[in-house]
Each structure stands twice: as structure tokens, then as C-alpha cells.
Amino acid sequence: MSETYRHFFVKALYDMRESVILGMDQRRKPQEKEGTKQMKFDMHCHTKEGSMDGKVPIDDFIAELIRKGFNGMLVSDHNSYNGYRTWKRNIKDQKFKDFVVLKGIEYDTIDAGHILVIMPETIKLKILELRGLPVQILIDIVHKNGGILGPAHPCGEKYLSFTNTLKKRNQMAVMNQFDFLEGFNACESVESNHCAKVLAEMYALPAFGGSDAHKTDCVGMAYTDIPEQIHCESDLIRAVKLGEGIKCGGSYYRGTTK
């Protein structure tokens, strides 16, 4: 997408955000909760054990997030749960007992870029580790099994992001089926994140913040504040469906790669 086209695309999104004529899903807008302690998560984390391009072992990832004041993380390796498995088999109940590690995945669809998926802790689906499903089939599988999903870096690079991969005529119908989206990614541009936040407003979706870290110096550069006590995947799913008071933000990673 050229810079000129991207500029007009973002402006058009902004201008349309309050539109009802286009038939957008006008779900209840999130309201901020009072009197509840926020939990701070990095919602986009790649580990050495689970991602081929990941450089940070999961125990080092956790230690760095704790040092930066985080309460938890969503492990979201590329088409793999191996990072989470390493934590569950070798680290859980031995170290970092007050830190919440949630099981997620960054799934590579054939037609809509990368999608973040979170399933209830009781559900195990091997198909989610086999990349290449069409996004509509992925949505159906996830929702039928009680999970939630949303696009990672939705306005990012071609073939990796939703708005620059899925055919434009199909985007609205699919957006209305997502449960959240990534509103701030530390490895994306200012423009890309602005576009993502406009989409979140248009479709009244909770917006996650995630570092998308593959290296130590990127860990924890983005955050998601959740006004709920989150101890497992089902807690997160419930909080996202409630949609109240979830906030995101962060800083920009200036390294040449993630």
C-alpha cells in the first residue's frame, strides 16, 4: 500500500467510525470500571521455545516483564504452543508463582494475515498449530469451542495484516465477527497503530496492546490494562466479552527487527 493510499485509507476509516448506514455492528461501547485493581499484561509475546524467530527463553521473558511491573503475559507464538508448553511443564509452580501466563497463539491464515487466538484452558485443538486456514473457518472453529480471536497488527504489512491481506469487500463482514483487535503493537508504525485504534472504535472492539517482542530489548514495550482479576484463559475471555475498561498503549521499538 502506497503512503498516499494509506493516508486516505486511514482518513476514510476515521470519517466512517460513527456511521450506522454501513451496517456496522454497534455493540455497547466499553465503560471504565471503578474500584477494581488493574492487571497489566503484554498480550503479544514470542518465545525462543515456540517461535523460530524468537530469541528470548520464556523464563527470561517472564523475568523481564516482572522487572517492568507486569502481572502477566499472553504467549502468542507463531502457529505453535511450544513456548507455553515449556512454561507449563518446566516452570509452572516452581518459579514466578504470582505471575500469570496465558496460552495463546498467533495464527497465520491463508487470506487474512495474522490472527491472535485465545481458547479456554480446557480446550486443546491441534488444528490451531497447522497454519493456513481461511479466516472464516478459523472464526467458526474458535467460536464453536468457546474461544475468542482478533487480528494482530491489523493495518500492518501486506500478507501479515488483516486490512492489507483480506479482500476489501469482505473486510466488514469478518470484522464484525472478531472479539477484539490489537490496537497497539510496539513493532508497528505510528500510522499503523492509529489505523488499528480507528478500527477498534468503528467496531466497538476491545483493543489489546502487545510488544510483539522477539528480542529482550523489546519485551514489555506495550501493555494491556484489564480491570479484572485474570488467572486463566477463561477469565480473559470473559473480560473481553464484557468489554469494559480494557486499555492499551506503549512505546515504539526502534530496532531493525522485532
Where are these regions (language model features)?
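Charged catalytic cores and adjacent phosphate/nucleic-acid-binding surfaces used
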Residues: 5-64, 70, 82-91, 96, ...
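Conserved beta-strand positions in the central sheet of alpha/beta enzyme cores
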Residues: 74-75, 150-151, 182
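Glycine-rich anion/phosphate-binding loops
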Residues: 129-132
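Acidic, metal/ion-coordinating pockets
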Residues: 79
